[in-house]
UniProtKB/Swiss-Prot annotation:
Signal peptide positions (record): none
InterPro entries found in the cross-reference section: Znf_C2H2_sf, Znf_C2H2_type
SUPFAM superfamilies assigned: beta-beta-alpha zinc fingers
SMART domains from the UniProt entry: ZnF_C2H2
Protein name: Uncharacterized zinc finger protein 70
Length: 70
């Protein structure tokens, strides 16, 4: 997955940001937490930030943040 594929990621943030949020409905990627929360409010009020997947902007891989309970 190329970094160029992210249409809504601005180039000045690309160098600073390591992780982004991916919307579970439309697949758009946001760097800032606040912009992702605003996007989720417009889509569906039942969605929470914890439903979003984190994605590495450098490699394009999904990052698992939640810790597993044993």
């Amino acid at each position: 997955m190329d970094l160029i594929a992210f249409k809504n990621v601005k180039s000045k943030f690309l160098l600073m940001a390591l992780l982004g949020y991916e919307c579970p409905i439309c697949g758009e990627i946001y760097i800032k937490r606040k912009s992702m929360i605003t996007h989720l409010r417009k889509h569906n009020t039942n969605l929470k930030l914890s439903n979003c997947r984190r994605i590495s902007l450098r490699t394009g891989e999904y990052i698992e943040i939640k810790t597993e309970e044993e």
